[in-house]
From Swiss-Prot:
Classification via PANTHER family: GLYCEROL KINASE (PTHR10196:SF69), SUGAR KINASE (PTHR10196)
Keyword Coiled coil: no
UniProt protein name: Glycerol kinase
Residue numbers binding sn-glycerol 3-phosphate: 12, 82-83, 134, 244
Catalytic activity annotation: glycerol + ATP = sn-glycerol 3-phosphate + ADP + H(+)
Superkingdom field: Bacteria
Binding-site residues for ADP, renumbered to this chain: 12, 16, 266, 310, 411, 415
Pathway note: Polyol metabolism; glycerol degradation via glycerol kinase pathway; sn-glycerol 3-phosphate from glycerol: step 1/1
PROSITE patterns the UniProt entry points to: FGGY_KINASES_1, FGGY_KINASES_2
Amino acid sequence: MSRYVGAIDQGTTSSRFIVFDREGSVIALAQAEHAQIYPAPGHVEHDATEIWTKTQSVMREALEKGGLQPSDLAAVGITNQRETTLIWDRKTGKPLHNALVWQDTRNDRLVAEFARDGGRDRFRDLTGLPLASYFSGLKLRWLLDHVAGARAKAEAGDVLFGNIDTWLVWNLTGGTEGGLHVTDVTNASRTQLMSLKTLEWDEGMLRTFGIPKAMLPKIVSSSEVYGETRAPFAGVPIAGILGDQQAALFGQTCFAPGEAKNTYGTGCFALMNTGEEPVPSKAGLVTTLAYRLDGQKPAYALEGSIAITGALVQWLRDNLHMIKDSAEVETLATTVEDNGGVYFVPAFSGLYAPHWNEGARGLIIGLTRYVNRGHIARSVLEATAFQTHEVLDAMAKDSGIPVKELRADGGMVANNTLMQFQADMLDVPVVRPKVAETTALGAAYAAGLAVGYWKGLDDLKRNWGVDKRWTPKMDAGRRETIAAAWSRAVQRSFDWKTDED
């Protein structure tokens, strides 16, 4: 058998290819960033052709770094930024428009239009999701309404829809020459077009949103052999697909109900495995697919999605020039003992879970002449922990299962100040695993299981280990006081943007 498994990790800011061995250790890695396109306030786009080019580049580079050939790979898995929405011409393979990124809010009027009859939760029982600009279905509707000729071509089957997983699989398996048009259940569950119960496209949702079924990919499991790569990586089975946050849950081996992880990246995404039945949320979370292995029952999850966390540190660096690199925010934050009474609500594109307020906008509140740059930096880090606290509290209310330990991954887990404050706010331990690349590892695990590289979930659990554990140190009175202050700040951010803006 081939010695390794590869994973394409296509994220919001970069594309990576990582090669893992049987113990889940990284053998080779390559990464390439792609452009972030901001054509107007609230608009965020990616060039899908650039993403495909960069994906091929990092695959070549990683194999070269490892001295490997495609034949050394038993399988390749794919994990991707979810919700980012693309349409392309089946015959030419060219996108009809830049991809609308998950953060893009240009469809907010469509959201409001559909919410007028039945409110934002009118489709929640069916799809698990509230009406929000975040999800793919109304991004796709916007493209069909605004790209000349797109709807007619889509109805004829000449225009295809996909999230980034679908785009990559289609190109990897031949593109215009017989490329496979598929998506897995985790990505499909983020479109608001799939029934959580049947795991199929829902005809009623398609009619309501005005989406031609002919343009949609086939829904498949998260772990099976879908097809093989074509040149220049010919013959490698593509055998795993997971949306990035579900991939992190899988890579963190959260296979039992009540086990939870939080990924600290551009945004924050907390998921809790809830088992074989979907748990409806009454506390502002979304109900989603955790994963589905080939031939097995699906596992469901509760998710709290937070739009801006690591991106707030980038904003501090790129827009305010308060720091030179992202790591410097911790140094600056530790120059002060606390936040000085300052709270930063990073509602740059509204607020996601648990508030779902499209009109919220960012604010810094509590400023006095006492406040300095250190307090601002600390408030930036604390905003991530406060938002995560809100989401984990909602998970406990919905599931009836309090989180006993939070498994953390993503770039921000290197920040000890943030992780300690997170443990303090949650009042439970926060754990960083030995293998940091949990998202890519989850995709590799899904692919490896499908081809027998790993025999079962127990093999994966044995690979997981603790790198560092943070335990709570804050007293309950202090925790309650600052949590209440944060809640007041959040309330003041609501509904700043109006239809006239």
